[in-house]
Amino acid sequence: METSRPLAVVTGASSGIGLELALQCASNGFDLVIASDRSQAEAEREIRARGARVRSIIADLGTEEGVEQLVGAIGGARVDALLANAGQGLGKAFLDQDFEALRHIVDTNITGTLALIHRIGRTMRDQGAGRILITGSIAGFMPGTFQAVYNGTKAFIDSFSWALRNELKDTGVTVTCLMPGATDTEFFQRADMLDTKVGSEKKADPAEVARIGFKAMMDGEGDVVAGFKNKLMAAAAHVTPASVLAEQHRKMAEPGTSERH
Protein backbone atom coordinates (compact mmCIF):
# COMPACT_ATOMS: atom_id res chain seq x y z
CA MET A 1 0.00 0.00 0.00
CA GLU A 2 1.50 3.34 -1.08
CA THR A 3 0.95 6.32 1.19
CA SER A 4 2.58 9.65 1.88
CA ARG A 5 1.36 9.62 5.48
CA PRO A 6 2.49 7.37 8.33
CA LEU A 7 0.99 3.89 8.05
CA ALA A 8 -0.70 2.02 10.89
CA VAL A 9 -1.72 -1.64 10.79
CA VAL A 10 -4.65 -2.51 13.07
CA THR A 11 -5.97 -6.03 13.63
CA GLY A 12 -9.39 -6.97 14.96
CA ALA A 13 -10.62 -3.69 13.51
CA SER A 14 -14.18 -4.55 12.49
CA SER A 15 -15.70 -3.40 15.79
CA GLY A 16 -15.05 -2.66 19.44
CA ILE A 17 -11.63 -1.60 20.68
CA GLY A 18 -9.97 -2.43 17.36
CA LEU A 19 -12.31 -0.19 15.38
CA GLU A 20 -11.85 2.62 17.87
CA LEU A 21 -8.06 2.24 17.72
CA ALA A 22 -8.25 2.48 13.93
CA LEU A 23 -10.34 5.65 14.23
CA GLN A 24 -7.79 7.11 16.64
CA CYS A 25 -5.08 6.45 14.07
CA ALA A 26 -7.15 7.98 11.26
CA SER A 27 -7.88 11.09 13.33
CA ASN A 28 -4.20 11.54 14.13
CA GLY A 29 -2.64 11.51 10.68
CA PHE A 30 -2.22 7.81 9.86
CA ASP A 31 -3.34 5.89 6.81
CA LEU A 32 -4.32 2.32 7.59
CA VAL A 33 -4.29 -1.32 6.71
CA ILE A 34 -6.96 -3.05 8.81
CA ALA A 35 -7.66 -6.74 9.24
CA SER A 36 -10.42 -8.83 10.78
CA ASP A 37 -12.06 -12.20 10.29
CA ARG A 38 -15.21 -10.58 8.88
CA SER A 39 -16.35 -7.62 6.78
CA GLN A 40 -15.04 -4.20 7.80
CA ALA A 41 -17.09 -2.12 5.36
CA GLU A 42 -18.50 0.13 8.07
CA ALA A 43 -15.05 0.56 9.59
CA GLU A 44 -13.69 1.57 6.19
CA ARG A 45 -16.38 4.23 5.80
CA GLU A 46 -15.72 5.68 9.24
CA ILE A 47 -11.96 5.76 8.65
CA ARG A 48 -12.31 7.48 5.28
CA ALA A 49 -14.68 10.02 6.82
CA ARG A 50 -11.72 11.09 8.96
CA GLY A 51 -9.60 11.80 5.90
CA ALA A 52 -7.46 8.66 5.95
CA ARG A 53 -6.77 6.10 3.27
CA VAL A 54 -7.50 2.52 4.23
CA ARG A 55 -7.06 -0.97 2.85
CA SER A 56 -9.17 -3.70 4.42
CA ILE A 57 -8.25 -7.38 4.62
CA ILE A 58 -10.52 -10.22 5.73
CA ALA A 59 -8.23 -12.85 7.22
CA ASP A 60 -8.13 -15.37 10.05
CA LEU A 61 -5.07 -14.20 11.97
CA GLY A 62 -5.09 -17.41 13.96
CA THR A 63 -3.64 -19.12 10.88
CA GLU A 64 -0.30 -18.81 9.12
CA GLU A 65 -2.15 -18.15 5.87
CA GLY A 66 -4.06 -15.26 7.41
CA VAL A 67 -0.92 -13.62 8.73
CA GLU A 68 0.77 -14.00 5.34
CA GLN A 69 -2.30 -12.50 3.66
CA LEU A 70 -2.04 -9.41 5.86
CA VAL A 71 1.72 -9.08 5.38
CA GLY A 72 1.18 -9.38 1.64
CA ALA A 73 -1.39 -6.58 1.71
CA ILE A 74 1.13 -4.32 3.42
CA GLY A 75 3.66 -5.10 0.70
CA GLY A 76 6.87 -3.16 1.01
CA ALA A 77 5.26 -0.17 2.70
CA ARG A 78 6.92 1.25 5.77
CA VAL A 79 4.83 0.45 8.86
CA ASP A 80 5.04 3.15 11.52
CA ALA A 81 2.59 1.62 14.00
CA LEU A 82 1.32 -1.91 14.57
CA LEU A 83 -1.73 -2.22 16.79
CA ALA A 84 -2.07 -5.95 17.44
CA ASN A 85 -5.58 -6.11 18.82
CA ALA A 86 -7.07 -9.30 17.33
CA GLY A 87 -8.24 -11.70 19.99
CA GLN A 88 -10.96 -14.14 20.97
CA GLY A 89 -12.46 -15.47 24.18
CA LEU A 90 -14.53 -18.47 25.20
CA GLY A 91 -16.58 -18.95 28.34
CA LYS A 92 -17.69 -22.02 30.31
CA ALA A 93 -15.64 -24.74 32.00
CA PHE A 94 -12.44 -25.88 30.32
CA LEU A 95 -13.41 -29.56 30.14
CA ASP A 96 -16.79 -28.68 28.62
CA GLN A 97 -15.31 -26.66 25.76
CA ASP A 98 -14.52 -27.93 22.28
CA PHE A 99 -10.76 -28.41 22.08
CA GLU A 100 -10.47 -27.06 18.54
CA ALA A 101 -12.20 -23.88 19.68
CA LEU A 102 -9.70 -23.64 22.55
CA ARG A 103 -6.81 -24.20 20.17
CA HIS A 104 -8.07 -21.39 17.94
CA ILE A 105 -8.07 -18.99 20.89
CA VAL A 106 -4.40 -19.81 21.51
CA ASP A 107 -3.63 -19.55 17.80
CA THR A 108 -5.30 -16.14 17.52
CA ASN A 109 -4.33 -14.54 20.82
CA ILE A 110 -0.77 -15.85 20.97
CA THR A 111 0.57 -17.57 17.85
CA GLY A 112 -0.89 -15.22 15.27
CA THR A 113 -0.04 -12.16 17.34
CA LEU A 114 3.57 -13.31 17.71
CA ALA A 115 3.87 -14.14 14.02
CA LEU A 116 2.69 -10.70 12.97
CA ILE A 117 4.86 -8.87 15.49
CA HIS A 118 7.85 -10.99 14.45
CA ARG A 119 7.41 -10.05 10.79
CA ILE A 120 6.64 -6.36 11.22
CA GLY A 121 8.86 -5.89 14.27
CA ARG A 122 11.93 -6.93 12.30
CA THR A 123 11.29 -4.30 9.65
CA MET A 124 10.69 -1.68 12.34
CA ARG A 125 14.00 -2.58 13.97
CA ASP A 126 15.75 -2.33 10.62
CA GLN A 127 14.24 1.10 9.94
CA GLY A 128 15.15 2.27 13.45
CA ALA A 129 11.67 3.42 14.39
CA GLY A 130 8.18 2.13 15.08
CA ARG A 131 5.44 1.76 17.64
CA ILE A 132 3.82 -1.52 18.67
CA LEU A 133 0.63 -1.61 20.73
CA ILE A 134 -0.53 -5.02 21.93
CA THR A 135 -3.96 -5.46 23.48
CA GLY A 136 -3.51 -7.51 26.62
CA SER A 137 -5.99 -7.48 29.50
CA ILE A 138 -6.23 -7.19 33.26
CA ALA A 139 -7.56 -10.75 32.89
CA GLY A 140 -3.91 -11.74 32.60
CA PHE A 141 -3.43 -10.89 36.27
CA MET A 142 -5.83 -13.53 37.61
CA PRO A 143 -6.67 -17.22 37.14
CA GLY A 144 -9.66 -17.22 34.80
CA THR A 145 -12.13 -19.66 36.27
CA PHE A 146 -14.59 -20.41 33.44
CA GLN A 147 -12.27 -18.45 31.11
CA ALA A 148 -9.15 -20.47 31.82
CA VAL A 149 -7.57 -20.43 28.37
CA TYR A 150 -8.42 -16.81 27.55
CA ASN A 151 -6.91 -15.48 30.77
CA GLY A 152 -3.87 -17.66 30.23
CA THR A 153 -3.30 -16.18 26.78
CA LYS A 154 -3.56 -12.67 28.17
CA ALA A 155 -1.09 -13.48 30.96
CA PHE A 156 1.31 -14.52 28.20
CA ILE A 157 0.73 -11.31 26.23
CA ASP A 158 1.12 -9.06 29.28
CA SER A 159 4.47 -10.69 30.08
CA PHE A 160 5.69 -10.95 26.49
CA SER A 161 5.14 -7.26 25.80
CA TRP A 162 7.48 -6.20 28.59
CA ALA A 163 10.17 -8.64 27.49
CA LEU A 164 9.98 -7.46 23.88
CA ARG A 165 10.02 -3.83 25.00
CA ASN A 166 13.26 -4.41 26.89
CA GLU A 167 14.85 -6.23 23.95
CA LEU A 168 14.03 -3.28 21.68
CA LYS A 169 14.88 -0.48 24.11
CA ASP A 170 17.85 0.83 22.11
CA THR A 171 16.36 0.41 18.63
CA GLY A 172 13.86 3.26 18.31
CA VAL A 173 10.95 0.79 18.48
CA THR A 174 8.58 1.06 21.43
CA VAL A 175 6.22 -1.63 22.75
CA THR A 176 3.11 -0.77 24.75
CA CYS A 177 0.58 -3.14 26.29
CA LEU A 178 -3.01 -1.91 26.58
CA MET A 179 -4.77 -3.71 29.43
CA PRO A 180 -8.51 -3.05 29.49
CA GLY A 181 -11.08 -4.69 31.69
CA ALA A 182 -14.59 -5.65 30.62
CA THR A 183 -15.49 -3.41 27.67
CA ASP A 184 -18.77 -2.84 25.85
CA THR A 185 -18.01 -4.82 22.70
CA GLU A 186 -19.20 -8.02 21.03
CA PHE A 187 -16.60 -10.01 22.98
CA PHE A 188 -18.98 -11.52 25.53
CA GLN A 189 -21.58 -12.42 22.92
CA ARG A 190 -19.00 -14.13 20.74
CA ALA A 191 -17.55 -15.89 23.81
CA ASP A 192 -21.02 -17.19 24.78
CA MET A 193 -20.89 -15.36 28.11
CA LEU A 194 -24.06 -13.26 28.13
CA ASP A 195 -25.44 -15.38 30.98
CA THR A 196 -22.55 -14.41 33.28
CA LYS A 197 -22.23 -11.52 35.73
CA VAL A 198 -19.33 -9.98 33.82
CA GLY A 199 -21.13 -10.46 30.53
CA SER A 200 -24.32 -8.74 31.64
CA GLU A 201 -23.11 -5.85 33.81
CA LYS A 202 -22.13 -2.31 32.75
CA LYS A 203 -18.83 -2.11 30.88
CA ALA A 204 -16.27 0.43 29.73
CA ASP A 205 -16.68 2.51 26.58
CA PRO A 206 -14.42 1.08 23.83
CA ALA A 207 -13.78 4.57 22.43
CA GLU A 208 -12.35 5.70 25.77
CA VAL A 209 -10.28 2.52 26.11
CA ALA A 210 -8.85 3.08 22.63
CA ARG A 211 -8.10 6.74 23.34
CA ILE A 212 -6.13 5.75 26.43
CA GLY A 213 -4.28 3.01 24.56
CA PHE A 214 -3.44 5.18 21.56
CA LYS A 215 -2.08 7.96 23.77
CA ALA A 216 0.05 5.48 25.72
CA MET A 217 1.45 4.11 22.44
CA MET A 218 2.27 7.56 21.11
CA ASP A 219 3.88 8.51 24.44
CA GLY A 220 5.98 5.33 24.36
CA GLU A 221 4.65 4.00 27.67
CA GLY A 222 5.30 0.39 28.65
CA ASP A 223 1.74 -0.41 29.61
CA VAL A 224 -1.52 1.20 30.56
CA VAL A 225 -4.53 -0.12 32.45
CA ALA A 226 -7.67 1.55 31.12
CA GLY A 227 -10.03 2.86 33.79
CA PHE A 228 -9.74 3.67 37.50
CA LYS A 229 -11.73 0.61 38.63
CA ASN A 230 -9.48 -1.63 36.55
CA LYS A 231 -6.37 0.00 38.01
CA LEU A 232 -7.63 -0.90 41.48
CA MET A 233 -8.38 -4.47 40.38
CA ALA A 234 -4.92 -4.82 38.82
CA ALA A 235 -3.20 -3.50 41.93
CA ALA A 236 -5.20 -5.82 44.18
CA ALA A 237 -4.44 -8.82 41.98
CA HIS A 238 -0.71 -8.44 42.66
CA VAL A 239 -1.18 -8.92 46.42
CA THR A 240 -4.08 -11.38 46.49
CA PRO A 241 -3.54 -15.17 46.67
CA ALA A 242 -4.25 -17.01 43.43
CA SER A 243 -6.85 -19.20 45.13
CA VAL A 244 -8.81 -16.12 46.17
CA LEU A 245 -8.55 -14.57 42.71
CA ALA A 246 -9.77 -17.81 41.12
CA GLU A 247 -12.83 -17.84 43.39
CA GLN A 248 -13.53 -14.17 42.66
CA HIS A 249 -13.34 -14.87 38.94
CA ARG A 250 -15.78 -17.77 39.33
CA LYS A 251 -18.33 -15.32 40.76
CA MET A 252 -17.98 -13.13 37.66
CA ALA A 253 -17.71 -15.73 34.89
CA GLU A 254 -19.62 -18.84 35.98
CA PRO A 255 -22.57 -19.55 33.66
CA GLY A 256 -25.83 -18.39 35.23
CA THR A 257 -24.31 -15.69 37.45
CA SER A 258 -26.13 -12.96 35.52
CA GLU A 259 -29.26 -14.04 37.41
CA ARG A 260 -27.62 -13.75 40.84
CA HIS A 261 -26.93 -10.02 41.01
Predicted segments — roles?
Residues 14-15:
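Conserved glycine-rich cofactor-binding loop
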Residues 28-43:
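Conserved glycine-rich Rossmann-like NAD(P)H-binding loop of the short-chain dehydrogenase/reductase
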Residues 49-64:
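Rossmann-fold cofactor-recognition segment
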Residues 93-94, 98-106:
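Substrate-binding pocket helix/loop in short-chain dehydrogenase/reductase
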Residues 117, 153:
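Active-site helix of classical SDR
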Residues 137:
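Residue(s) in the substrate-gating loop at a strand-loop-helix junction
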Residues 177, 197-234:
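C-terminal helical subdomain
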